[in-house]
């Protein structure tokens, strides 16, 4: 059996513990170090996963250990420093999580430093890594369903266009094999629009895509939220990580739902966290395309910022890529500062016994 990948977990809050649980279960990975600022949680999570190399932060960890992989699962404010520390330490691959940053310049810096050092920069636990979405994307590329004629997005981000909405944006770009090149938007309420955060901001928009498609975007649900893509006789509906398929029409002209017959997923316990991690390992080992990359998270941030500023400036069409890389959009406080700093701290008892769930 090949030598196990040595993994460092940077940040062991609730989501970091999910990552640790997955890496602990895979046969070809082992957790060799943990960095966690909370002293009590660091101790109990180390005990839970049998890890004795415990550190306060990423910089302290990398002075002693250079693992193969580093999983950065920190509140948004602290992601950049840890990702860059991992790249400069010489890891083979580093994963982040959502949202990658608040400012485009910070996202650019992470992407550029990893690229310059030959470090795989993976995106983390995002729905785009779902095996159903990845299999659908492969089928679309192979022409199974014909030419894409349209796309639409409902309930974008559920009032968090960056912190939550990065999910749908990454899937939209994947399934259409296209980039968003122009955004025009309408948003409210006004106080949310004028703030520096996406918290409570509802956005309606029109995205122009590099392949000629126009994608209408609604802030609200119409009984479901998610992404619809259609061809001449097929409608593909993405609801989070799950995909529904409609092909052909009945006698009344109504679409007929069919079984997409996706292949079996080898790690159902881990859902798209599992497929995301396997994608990172494959990229490190074989140079294969990542299911979700740091670049993808940067693109999602850029689209969200463009939508916010288009509305703020009076529904002005905004071209992408944005020239001003200092533009900023903070996520909700709990995403930016973490649960401990936003009124939802994790107890030691929960950290000691928390079961793995996605």
Which residue ranges define each predicted feature?
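Rossmann-like dinucleotide-binding domain that binds NAD(P)(H)
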Residues: 149-224, 228, 295
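A contiguous active-site-proximal alpha/beta segment in oxidoreductase catalytic domains
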Residues: 69, 95, 100-160
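Glycine- and charged-residue-rich phosphate/anionic-cofactor binding loop of Rossmann-like
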Residues: 30-33, 283-298
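NAD(P)-dinucleotide binding in Rossmann-like oxidoreductases
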Residues: 193-198, 210-276, 293, 307, ...
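Aromatic/hydrophobic pocket-lining residues that form π-stacking "cages" and hydrophobic walls in ligand
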Residues: 42, 82, 110, 136, ...
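A contiguous, mid-protein "functional segment" used to position or interact
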Residues: 74, 290-332
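N-terminal Rossmann-like dinucleotide-binding module
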Residues: 1-49
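Beta-loop-alpha module in the N-terminal Rossmann-like domain of NAD(P)-dependent dehydrogenases
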Residues: 19, 49-114
